[in-house]
Amino acid sequence: MKIIWFFRSVLFSIGQITTLILFSVLGQFTRPFSFATRYQFMHYWARFCVVWVRWTCGVKYRVHGAENINNNTAGLILARHESAWETFAFQAIFPRQAYVLKRELLKVPFFGWGMALLNPIAIDRAAGRKALNQLVSEGVERLEQGDWVVVFPEGTRMPAGELGKINIGGAMLASKAKAPVYLVAHNAGEFWPKNSFIKRPGCIDVYISKPLDTAEMSASEINQQVESWLSQHLSSAQASADAKEEIHHKS
């Protein structure tokens, strides 16, 4: 079975890398145009990856709480980070977004070139308080421009089922912006694990909260709520994955 998964993952990677090179090079010709135009162009690559991994590796997904999304008001997404999958899939689930990411990622050939077209909030983690201030100021600016902002408060990809430390940056932005906040949990790491070449077939469960009203909440209070919600729904996502694994073995 793992041999089949390996060759299916090879096929996925060939398609992903080939189209990444194509989109990142052609995307440079969209630089003179608006951010909306650049985003729309690169957005097709992200959506392709979601479809391609389903066709080649059998990685599907279903969303719980899609009805909670208000497409008319830009929101802040504080999401679980387990895999590369969510960076693609969120572009199929939510409206136009700006990502908060490590500045070093923009130096990665092809991938970084494409990301630079999307006006990300690229921070230097070593800058400490300066990086937090940048996250808040640029995040507020993007939200005011009508773009959603995606923050992974754990700061890095975590193993499936393991909750990392919830950093304060996303909560500080939520407190300052007073924008609706959506919490997102999923179990993508069960099927597309961190640092693993092989993708396992299965269905990723994505949980989206109702928008939180943070107008009267401090950053600390928001952070506590984020940690509590993610912990609870991480357990739900893990239980769902375990149930599917048991059914798979029985069959």
Model-flagged regions — what are they?
Residues 20-47, 55-57, 71-128:
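Catalytic core of membrane glycerolipid acyltransferases/transacylases, capturing the structured
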Residues 4-11, 15, 19-22, 26, ...:
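Membrane-interacting alpha-helical segments
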Residues 56-64, 132-133, 187-190:
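Short gly/ser/thr-rich secondary-structure transition/capping motifs
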Residues 64, 101-102, 123-125, 153, ...:
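Thr-Gly-centered strand-to-loop micro-motif
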Residues 3, 133-251:
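Non-catalytic C-terminal accessory region of glycerolipid acyltransferases
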Residues 63, 77, 99-100, 206-208:
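Generic preference for hydrophobic
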Residues 65-70:
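Glycine-rich helix-loop-beta junction characteristic of Rossmann-like nucleotide cofactor-binding loops
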